[in-house]
């Protein structure tokens, strides 16, 4: 019940915005990662070119950022439950009891763990456009789920449940600073493409505009960080899918992800390789040396993968093996690869003479949870 009450409070309450921690975004792989920041999608007018420009403004450090380098990371502390009944205007998000990711329009004093995300018109003057305001038009959305932006259930600005091309708009004001409630009903990578428009007051001509994309990581899984790192804003394209073979080395992206290989490089040097290990007892054991990336504790941990070691006598029939001193094999640390990636050895417990297996391989499984 607590989650439902919190959701309803966010729908109807628009209070003073809490001041957040005043920190810069985290830099990661060429991206600026916004998590618990006070940050807006901003529109400004470039009078020299008669152009309306969309960018990102961070209120915490009063700095503008390019959309192509900005990522909004929405963690699982934004997870809420839809109430019973779901207000009519919000039905696109799901059924009563469904979980959604909710970005609130305001934060309680002292809440520094969630994002405060809005719209602003810094750099847009009262006399720049004939219309005065500049609409933030949601032109397209790529991703696994739906997106809504609303003030209340009777005033929904964006709704991807509407027909394509009619998702809606939010009217941004000159110098404005607006916060509304956002809802995403699926985890994963979402890319929102926005457009704006207006008539230049000084010339009477339409302002030059272009579609601009903004990337949201909604409670992402580890492999989605890998896709972002290697494919950027093309992370949702077919060639970035885990089951897609890399044109550079022919490996499925899932294999490149599992062993932290560059999908754009032709080299296969980082693939697992067999070894004969001479143990402390003087006996030889078959082993498989492989990269086991650790990554950032909150990013590329490979926590969504299962590394299933399998053994075979003839390369035709394969048997799943269990890890453990009393089972089939042990995992032991084997230093680092040339790029610092941790190396592990999967070493059979039985000697070469006693083991029924002459060949080893890993079966990589993406955990569905």
Model regions: which residues?
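Short tyrosine-centred short linear motifs in exposed loops/low-complexity segments
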Residues: 178, 186-190
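Short strand-edge motifs at loop-to-beta-strand transitions and within beta-strands
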Residues: 178-182, 344
């Amino acid at each position: 019940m607590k989650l439902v009450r919190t959701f309803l409070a966010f729908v109807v309450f628009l209070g003073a915005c809490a001041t957040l921690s005043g920190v810069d975004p985290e830099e990661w792989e060429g991206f600026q990662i916004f998590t618990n920041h006070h940050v807006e999608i901003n529109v400004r007018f470039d009078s020299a070119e008669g152009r309306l420009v969309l960018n990102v403004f961070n209120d915490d450090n009063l700095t503008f950022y390019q959309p192509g380098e900005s990522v909004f990371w929405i963690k699982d502390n934004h997870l809420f439950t839809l109430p019973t009944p779901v207000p009519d205007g919000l039905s696109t998000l799901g059924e009563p009891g469904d979980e959604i990711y909710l970005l609130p329009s305001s934060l309680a004093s002292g809440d520094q763990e969630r994002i405060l995300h809005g719209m602003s018109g810094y750099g847009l003057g009262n006399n720049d456009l004939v219309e005065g305001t500049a609409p933030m038009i949601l032109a397209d959305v790529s991703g696994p789920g739906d997106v809504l932006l609303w003030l209340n259930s009777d005033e929904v600005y964006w709704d991807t449940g509407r027909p394509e091309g009619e998702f809606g708009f939010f009217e941004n004001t000159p110098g404005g600073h607006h916060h509304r409630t956002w809802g995403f009903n699926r985890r994963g990578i979402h890319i929102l493409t926005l457009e704006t428009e207006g008539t230049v007051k000084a010339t009477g001509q339409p302002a030059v505009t272009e579609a601009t994309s903004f990337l949201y990581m909604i409670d992402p899984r580890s492999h989605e960080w890998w896709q972002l790192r290697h494919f950027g804003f093309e992370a949702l394209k077919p060639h970035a899918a885990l089951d897609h073979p890399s044109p550079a080395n022919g490996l499925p992206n899932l294999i490149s992800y599992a062993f932290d290989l560059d999908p754009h490089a032709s080299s296969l040097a980082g693939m697992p390789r067999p070894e004969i290990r001479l143990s402390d007892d003087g006996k030889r054991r078959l082993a498989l040396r492989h990269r086991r990336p650790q990554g950032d504790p909150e990013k590329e941990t490979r926590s969504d993968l299962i590394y299933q070691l399998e053994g075979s006598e003839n390369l035709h029939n394969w048997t799943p093996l269990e890890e453990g001193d009393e089972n089939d094999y042990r995992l032991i640390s084997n230093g680092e690869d040339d790029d610092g990636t941790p190396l592990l050895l999967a070493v059979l417990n039985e000697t070469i003479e006693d083991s029924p297996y002459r060949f080893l391989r890993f079966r990589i499984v993406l955990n569905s949870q």
